[in-house]
């Protein structure tokens, strides 16, 4: 059986211009698995990326919006962020919560030569492999 790191490696190997892939625990911010081919993606850098992803999906800002929506709608709204695509001057970041594991996030980082559709397709296909491996 493959490990989370093996699946992350397969994502990076299969997608043109992929730089790295990771799986993050949204409760703790800990990396559950990672693979990259960029020398400056150090452990501390990857930890910072994981923490930023947690903030985007479960941070105070989104929690505040979800609380307000809950009040307006009269029903609980939580963990509403499912996918985010972020663009920086040189990279694309694809982030998706694993549907059956609502506290686990899969992340793909590519260069700008990557096709956006292929990035999403590759990450979503890998999620099926990641689901049984994640806590």
What does each model-identified segment do?
Residues 1-135:
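Non-catalytic interaction/Regulatory regions outside core domains
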């Amino acid at each position: 059986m493959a490990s989370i790191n093996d699946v992350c490696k397969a994502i990076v190997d299969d997608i043109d211009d992929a730089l790295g892939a990771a799986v993050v625990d949204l409760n703790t911010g800990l990396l559950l698995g990672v693979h990259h081919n960029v020398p400056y993606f150090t452990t501390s850098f990857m930890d910072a990326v994981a923490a930023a992803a947690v903030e985007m999906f479960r941070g105070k800002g989104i929690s505040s919006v979800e609380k307000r929506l809950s009040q307006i709608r009269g029903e609980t709204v939580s963990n509403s962020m499912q996918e985010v695509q972020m663009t920086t001057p040189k990279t694309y970041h694809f982030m998706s919560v694993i549907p059956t594991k609502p506290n686990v996030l899969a992340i793909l980082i590519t260069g700008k030569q990557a096709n956006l559709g292929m990035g999403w397709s590759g990450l979503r296909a890998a999620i099926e492999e990641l689901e049984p491996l994640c806590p």
